[in-house]
Amino acid sequence: NEFRLSSKTKADEEAIHVFAENLRQLLLASPLGSKKVLALDPGYRTGCKLVCLDAQGNLVYNTAIYPHPPQNEWQASVATIKQLVAKYDIEAIGVGNGTAGRETETLVRSIDFGKTVNIFQVNESGASIYSASEVAREEFPDQDVTVRGAVSIGRRLLDPLSELVKIDPKSIGVGQYQHDVNQVKLKSALDRVVESAVNFVGVDVNTASKHLLQYVSGISSTLAGNIVAYRTQNGPFKSRDELKKVSLMGPKTFEQCAGFLRIPGAANPLDNSSVHPERYSLVEQMAADVQATLEDLIKKAELRKQINKRKYITETVGEFTIEDILKELEKPGRDPRAQIEEFRFDETIKSIEDVKVGMTVPGIVTNITAFGAFVDIGVKQDGLVHVSQLSNKYVSDPNEVVKLNQKVQVTVTEVDVARKRIGLTMKTAGGNERTVGAGGERKERDNRPAKNFNKKPEPLNAFQSKLMDLKKKFND
């Protein structure tokens, strides 16, 4: 029992670690930013729900189109999309990656808009959970679940972090065995990841929802609601100092949260940076010492190079703090997340029947587990790159090689249409390691002493004997 408990605890810790790391990567996925978007939640019989959002993610229009069987209103759908892109000055289109996603993407890509409109596939896992949630009902009391789901897809494209915090992380589908692990420990770990991601990126206090604000360090759910209520009543915050007027925003809370709240366009440019208000006087002193204004210090790298870091080190301000401040002054308020890139699947692949062994195709990493990575290559079933196939070198942790939403090139090694399984490899040609189906160990391990296969096996205890019986059952 002790051994079983120890094994379960270790397995739980590993599963929680995998889920937490995947969630962190998903939350920090590349945002499109403030752009007007058209989002499509694809479907066949029930049609594709279509919404237009403004640059802040507000719903401005919704309708449905029926380009696929049984209605097959392809040309009418093309005309509707083209008209809406022109009417609402749409800059990008997001297509959900669920049922009929590829066909809908093909439809959108066939349209000549007469201008550049970037098209993205958006992971819609959990969108249906959001659309039926209390949060969604509160945001869109007069819309049905299909409209809410399409809005969620569009907002995920604009800013994945702001939208995904509204969904229970367990519904996003990026873990392994998450329903079998200790749920209290899992929730605690995931909450820490969300809070860490939100604080890492920072939050625009004038546009953030209360669901996002409550993950900022020091801000409770009640205070988040008070911030939104104050903003609604008094208009946008003009400075970080104004936050002190919000009910329940005490000095200690302000000290905890101020550095993570951004105010774009504030009179003091530091209000849109990660520099904490208690360090403003230090930055102002730096500017004065090089005979420059705060704005000049931010704009001109040559002025920042003149700063003698050691001069500002005190008991409470270390060298690392000074370096962090100077780094932030290079690009105040910069988003630390990577820039979004447009991606296309192989146009010749529409279903698993089109996938052939030996094909090299582009794909997107959709899930990472301890045993490998799942990759979407544009068919309904994701393919698996086993951990042994991720690299020509030995890999102990798949996260060392791939990240969620990463664009990768994969080669098909196995296709089982009946069981809907696709085996993939990311190994490059010329590697010394074995490919799927070949024998032998990895070269890195060849220097280990050879096993003596003539040696008599050690006697089994009762537990080992049962374990061996189980293994035989699964292998037979």
Language-model segments: what does each one mean?
Residues 261-476:
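Single-stranded RNA-binding regions, centering on S1/OB-family and related RNA-binding modules
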Residues 129, 138-236, 251, 255-282, ...:
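Long, highly charged, low-complexity intrinsically disordered interaction regions
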Residues 37-39, 49, 105-107, 239-242, ...:
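Short beta-alpha junctions and helix-cap segments that line functional grooves
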Residues 57-90, 94:
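Nucleic-acid-processing active sites and adjacent nucleic-acid-binding tracks
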Residues 3, 91-100, 120:
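Short glycine-rich phosphate-binding loop at a beta-alpha junction
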Residues 61-74, 144-145, 387-398:
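Flexible beta-alpha connector loops of hexameric P-loop NTPases
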Residues 31-59, 250:
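Gly/Thr-rich phosphate-binding beta-strand-loop-beta motif of the actin/hexokinase/Hsp70
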Residues 1-36, 55, 78-83:
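Extended, highly charged clamp/arch subdomains and adjacent linkers
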